[in-house]
Swiss-Prot record:
It catalyses: L-tyrosine(in) + H(+)(in) = L-tyrosine(out) + H(+)(out). The gene is tyrP-A. The keyword S-adenosyl-L-methionine does not apply. It comes from Haemophilus influenzae (strain ATCC 51907 / DSM 11121 / KW20 / Rd). It is found in: Cell inner membrane. Pfam families: Trp_Tyr_perm. Keywords: Amino-acid transport, Cell inner membrane, Cell membrane, Membrane, Symport, Transmembrane, Transmembrane helix, Transport. This is Tyrosine-specific transport system 1. The keyword Transport applies. GO terms for biological process: amino acid transmembrane transport. The chain crosses the membrane at residues 5-25, 34-54, 80-100, 117-137, 143-163, 176-196, 211-231, 250-270, 273-293, 313-333, 335-355, 370-390. Its main location: membrane. It is a multi-pass membrane protein.
């Protein structure tokens, strides 16, 4: 049970990133009602796709990575494609977290410490927990997660009493904005790259992994809804639009909330929350990347690497990009939605489709049957095509 609790918090901690706080800017022109529907729908979609991995792990060893699952049903080609997409995506995310974490750490260090030293220190300090092992990540994540929740509770306690029901009844200024916001909220429910690590940590316990995914994602959904409720209830739609014109950043949102609540505590609590959210996301993503590399070496090259070697392979490439070629990971992140959709929706749907033919009587099957698999696949593909429609001018732009 202790590992199950830790795994649940790792699911939530990986999903709840610093970007959560700026999500109301994405939904600024939509209104709370449609934002709520969108969040519930995408949570259901991505929780369903995550549970497909639980079904799959009944047919594989508990330490099998996503690449191994792909090879089991689609051969070497499946492994190559699945591993390449996942590693590129996770490397890009880690580079972004390292860069952001270094900037946060720089504010706490003497001026003589430059940007590169701050980035290096952040990587060494928090990367060490990942190198030590999942148990170590579990322990530090629990502490950070509960402090993060405390900071979030402080913010909510100051904002919720000030909300106005009329603000929550605002309707979209343009219904097309609902479609445009979908990809941003879609990726906000991403933790699927960490599922192999969690399954290994839980020794292949299907019930425990299912519980961790359902409860961890539900915690995230509740946090997203409460934050949207607080901001949309506090600010009118006109005030949101003014923020988008003057300062479409988290800082602009914090200033607007201060103007209404008059509390300086909000800014401090928001900064603490965003810092801890970045770290917990880094831990979850980093753990998933390290074990993806371990799976690749072990099963494709018959190499059993030590944790330090795996740590170097995990963190040196994104560290180099963050220090010397930031344009590289920014370019990769430009296709983050497409890569995420592939390994979080397209891949598990395809694998389960084949697994159900090969193993007709699995003890646990995700609800819905093959028709639901097709619907989920189509929705995933449609959502990832939306950014292209925005760039082409067919849909309105949103922040995010």
């Amino acid at each position: 049970m202790n590992k199950t609790v830790g795994s649940t918090l790792l699911v939530a901690g990986t999903m709840i990133g610093a970007g959560m706080l700026a999500m109301p800017l994405t939904s600024a022109g939509i209104g709370f009602g449609f934002t709520l529907v969108l969040l519930l729908g995408l949570w259901a979609l991505l929780t369903f796709s995550a549970l497909l991995f639980v079904e799959l792990y009944q047919t594989a060893e508990s330490d099998a990575g996503i690449g191994t699952l792909a090879e089991q049903y689609f051969g070497k080609t499946g492994r190559i494609i699945a591993t390449a997409v996942l590693i590129i995506f996770l490397y890009a995310l880690i580079a972004a977290y390292i860069s952001g974490g270094g900037s946060l750490l720089k504010d706490l260090l003497p001026e003589s410490f430059g940007d590169k030293v701050s980035v290096l220190l952040f990587t060494v300090i928090f990367g060490s927990f990942i190198v030590i092992g999942t148990h170590s990540v579990d322990k530090i994540n629990r502490v950070l997660f509960f402090v993060m929740l405390a900071a979030f509770a402080v913010v909510l306690s100051l904002m919720l009493p000030e909300i106005k029901f009329d603000n929550l009844m605002a309707t979209p200024i343009d219904k097309a904005l609902i479609i445009s916001a979908s990809p941003v909220f879609f990726t906000a429910f991403g933790f699927h790259g960490s599922i192999p690590s969690l399954n290994k940590y839980l020794d292949g316990n299907v019930k425990a992994l299912r519980f961790s995914i359902l409860v961890g994602s539900a915690i995230t959904l509740c946090a997203y809804i409460l934050w949207q409720l607080s901001t949309h209830g506090l600010l009118t739609q006109n005030e949101f639009l003014q923020i988008l014109k003057e300062d479409a950043t988290l800082n602009g949102l914090v200033k607007a909330t201060f103007a209404i609540t008059g509390s300086n505590v909000i800014a401090s609590a928001v900064k603490l929350f965003s810092t801890l959210a970045l770290i917990t996301s880094f831990l979850g993503v980093g753990l998933g990347l390290l074990e993806c590399i371990e799976d690749l070496l072990k099963r494709s090259f018959n190499v059993t690497a030590g944790r330090i070697s795996l740590g170097l392979l995990t963190f040196i490439p994104p560290l180099v990009f963050a220090l010397f070629y930031p344009e590289g990971f920014i370019l990769a992140l430009g296709y983050a939605g497409q890569m995420f959709a592939f390994y979080a929706v397209v891949l598990p749907v395809s694998l389960v489709w084949k697994a159900r033919r090969a193993h007709a009587n699995l003890p646990y099957k995700v609800w819905g049957g093959n028709l639901t698999l097709i619907i989920v696949l189509v929705l995933g593909v449609l959502i990832t095509s939306i950014p292209f429609a925005i760039r082409a001018g067919y849909l309105p732009f949103v922040v995010g």
